[in-house]
């Protein structure tokens, strides 16, 4: 048994949202009780104590859309590439990288992503992977890294026809095999969706194969209308809009399916998303960085669509994404009073509701029976801090880098900015060698 206390406790439980000197009692994989530190210490005198040292104690965060394959791209410049539009960004950088990823490259990307996520207080990742240099077994390799380090993960492989029929078939098979394996485990730490890249790189025939292989086992995780090219492809080649196309194919939209980006959609398409219970995930920084537009999240909320928040691997800091979401929505809508409730709902409520479709234990909340995913942030405010203004401090005062300790599924995996029972230096050294190998292949030089 463990007590995490001596800090400001944010529970995200509407019945008991905030305790000034709070504590969380953890037993096994679950939260057993929350209360004041004095109460919990008196009730459980023999419990191990994790001292928050006056910081902020809060539920671990969920990143609802990321890409492990980008894990070795930080600092990389590919010679001769100066991408002028979204398609060139994909062709010059991301598809170029994933074509060069072997199994070791994928493993190194997974280490980089998982370690940095945990450092930033992220306890659950929802990943959409691609490594067309080597496909079979990649999701199992990523799963092994997630289990080794201790992060909670929902994984899929992005099916795409961009590298030919053999790679397309392998990517479908990788999804199907991993989804069946994950379903058989009955393990809240690892789950699966069935991935697809985007409509403009997947034919109807391939979508039908994906639906058949999935056979209703899990939901789909697909990019939709991230760029206008996706819309034009559907209109020119299929005589309908992207969501109409998915609806006609059948078996894809639904309550366990999540669509990435969803920037260039019509009102009718949004109505279909709502009617089918399909989820969307917004990635504000990535959309701005790729210059593809701003997702109509306010309209989605007005229609009652379940919208989550991800990063698209632009960052692993969810609080950073929350800040940027607020700024871009206000800028885009030219209204300084919008986006606050939507952004905080996406990150702190909707991401957890999304994972509730794949995880039996409640996430994103510190209450009896919830998963013991807890973080401690070094944050000592110089203005009043209470349940009335928690999110104001989150948006304007806190960052992922404030995170000092991360507990996942009841285990301390990162304490006082050091990983527990993990040789981080050895992992970093090996990952560095893999990144040098990848960069060398991309730039035809030695690093």
Predicted regions and their residues:
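Glycine-enriched alpha-helix->loop->beta-strand junction motifs that scaffold or abut catalytic
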Residues: 150, 214-219, 251-255, 272-281, ...
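Alpha-helical scaffold segments that flank or form the walls of functional sites
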Residues: 76-128, 133-151, 173-185, 432-437, ...
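Active-site microenvironment of metallo-dependent hydrolases
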Residues: 1-22, 27-32, 37, 43, ...
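Active-site gating loops and adjacent loop-to-helix segments of metal-dependent hydrolytic enzymes
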Residues: 72-106, 163-164, 228-254, 276-279, ...
């Amino acid at each position: 048994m463990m007590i995490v206390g001596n800090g400001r406790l944010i529970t995200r439980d509407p019945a008991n949202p905030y305790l000034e000197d709070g504590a969380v009692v953890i037993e096994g994989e679950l939260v057993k009780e929350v209360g004041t530190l004095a109460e919990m210490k008196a009730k459980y005198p023999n419990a191990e104590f994790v001292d928050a040292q006056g910081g902020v104690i809060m539920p671990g965060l969920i990143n609802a859309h990321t890409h492990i394959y980008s894990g070795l791209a930080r600092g990389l410049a590919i010679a001769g590439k100066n991408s002028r539009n979204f398609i060139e960004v994909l062709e010059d950088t991301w598809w170029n990288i994933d074509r060069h990823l072997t199994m070791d490259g994928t493993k190194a990307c997974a280490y980089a992503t998982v370690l940095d996520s945990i450092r930033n207080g992220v306890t659950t990742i929802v990943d959409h992977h691609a490594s067309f240099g080597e496909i079979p077994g990649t999701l199992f390799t990523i799963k092994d890294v997630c289990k080794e380090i201790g992060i909670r993960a929902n994984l899929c492989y992005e099916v795409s026809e961009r590298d030919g029929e053999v790679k397309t078939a392998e990517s479908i098979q990788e999804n199907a095999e991993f989804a069946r394996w994950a379903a058989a485990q009955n393990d809240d730490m690892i789950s699966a969706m069935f991935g697809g890249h985007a409509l403009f790189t997947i034919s109807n025939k391939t979508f039908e194969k994906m639906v058949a292989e999935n056979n209703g086992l899990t939901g789909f995780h697909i990019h939709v209308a991230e760029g206008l090219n996706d819309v034009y492809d559907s209109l020119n080649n299929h005589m309908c809009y992207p969501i109409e196309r998915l609806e006609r194919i059948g078996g894809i939209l639904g309550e366990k399916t999540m669509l990435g980006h969803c920037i260039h959609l019509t009102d009718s398409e949004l109505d279909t998303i709502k009617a089918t219970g399909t989820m969307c995930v917004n990635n504000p920084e990535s959309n701005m960085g790729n210059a593809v537009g701003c997702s109509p999240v306010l309209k989605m909320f007005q229609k009652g669509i379940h919208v989550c928040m991800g990063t698209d691997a632009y960052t692993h800091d969810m609080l950073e994404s929350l800040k940027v979401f607020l700024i871009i929505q206000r800028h885009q809508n030219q209204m300084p009073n919008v986006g606050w409730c939507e952004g905080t709902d996406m990150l702190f409520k909707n991401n957890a509701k999304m994972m509730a479709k794949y995880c039996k234990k409640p996430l994103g909340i510190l209450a009896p029976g919830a998963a013991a995913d807890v973080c401690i942030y070094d944050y000592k405010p110089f203005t009043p801090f209470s349940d009335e203004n928690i999110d104001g401090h989150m948006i304007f005062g806190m960052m992922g880098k404030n995170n000092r300790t991360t507990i996942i599924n009841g285990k301390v995996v990162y304490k006082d900015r050091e990983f527990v029972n993990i040789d981080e230096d050895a992992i970093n050294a090996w990952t560095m060698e893999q990144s040098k190998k990848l960069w060398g292949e991309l730039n035809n030089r030695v690093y």
